[in-house]
Structures are given as structure tokens and as C-alpha cells.
Amino acid sequence: MALVENLQQAVDALRKGCVIAYPTEGVFGLGCDPDNQTAMLRLLAIKQRPVEKGVILIAASYAQLRPYVDETQLTAEQLTQVLASWPAPLTWVMPASGDTPSWVRGQFDTVAVRVSDHPVVQKLCLAFGKPLTSTSANLSGQPACVTQQEVMVQLGNQIAVVVEGKTSGRHGPSEIRDARSLQVLRQG
């Protein structure tokens, strides 16, 4: 495992199917290429997370998320509300497109997506050219890591790269809302 300032090293690791850790608004996230099944299964094994739960996709812009979302199942008002809320630490559960891999959406016909305002996430997703998975960096039953040092202690031997940086200081993970009902699914 390497602690890197150079985002290109993280992008190279993602392209090779590796799992990385990176800072987000509130906690460090674990990420991989959402379209690489081997990488996703590796991430889920590290987290000890069942594939049925699905994972969040995090991106620099909605354009990066659009291929994973079925906009035809949303009203114009619903889509406008979602887009107006970003970038922010707000995750929306939206109808999944037919191209969204089952290992991303889990047992659901929806996909959880977020456009982050964190500068490291923005740069990383732009350099990678697509979204990353975003699940809290921690082992099952352990608290989410909020510093690079915590990531290295808890997960260092299981991930390829820790991207240097700090969280934005937000306490806890992002809020999650349903795009169709607007119901809050997880308080943020």
C-alpha cells in the first residue's frame, strides 16, 4: 500500500482493478472501478459487505453518472431537484439503467449516486474519466476512517493506494434520499 499525492498513481491503480482509499466530505472512502467485477468483488471482500446491499457511485459531475441512471423513470421536476442539490454530500437513490452492473446496484433496481464537491474526489473522477465506488473505509464493525493514518492502520495491507488528503470536516457519511419519493433514507 502506498500513500500518494500524485493522483495519476491512484488512477493507474484503479485501471488495474485495484481498490484505493480517498478522502470525501466526511470520511475516507474505498473506491474501485464500478464496471470491473473483479475489483468490486475485492472491495466487497475487504468490507465484508454482501453484494446484495449495493454501493454508492461518486462522481465529479452528473454527466459521469448519467449512464448508470434511467432518467425515463423520473419526472422533470424530480431530476431538476436532484441536479440542483449537487455538488454536495447528498446521495440520491435513482432508477438504475439497464447498463448498471448488478454488483453496483445489489438486489435493487436503483443505484445510489452522488456528485461530490470534495476537491480530491473531483480531480480523481475527472482524471479517471468516470465515477468511483464510494463506501466508507473501514472493516465491518469498525468505525469509518476519517484520517489517512486510520486507513493505513485498519486497511493498509488490503488496498493498493491511499490518496493523500483530508476530509472536508463533515461529521459522518452523506445523507441519502430517494429521488422519486424525496424521502430521507439515511440522515446526514
UniProtKB/Swiss-Prot annotation:
Function, as annotated: Required for the formation of a threonylcarbamoyl group on adenosine at position 37 (t(6)A37) in tRNAs that read codons beginning with adenine. Catalyzes the conversion of L-threonine, HCO(3)(-)/CO(2) and ATP to give threonylcarbamoyl-AMP (TC-AMP) as the acyladenylate intermediate, with the release of diphosphate.
Major subcellular site: cytoplasm
Keyword terms of this UniProt record: ATP-binding, Cytoplasm, Nucleotide-binding, Nucleotidyltransferase, Transferase, tRNA processing
Superkingdom to which the source organism belongs: Bacteria
Designated name of the protein: Threonylcarbamoyl-AMP synthase
Reaction(s) catalysed by this chain's protein: L-threonine + hydrogencarbonate + ATP = L-threonylcarbamoyladenylate + diphosphate + H2O
Domain YrdC-like stretches: 4-188
The EC number(s) this enzyme carries: 2.7.7.87
One example GO MF annotation: L-threonylcarbamoyladenylate synthase
Record GO biological process: regulation of translational fidelity; tRNA threonylcarbamoyladenosine modification
Cell compartment(s), UniProt: Cytoplasm
GO cellular component entries: cytoplasm
Pfam families from the UniProt entry: Sua5_yciO_yrdC
Family: Belongs to the SUA5 family. TsaC subfamily.
Gene name linked to the record: tsaC
Keyword Cytoplasm among UniProt keywords: yes
Enzyme class: transferase
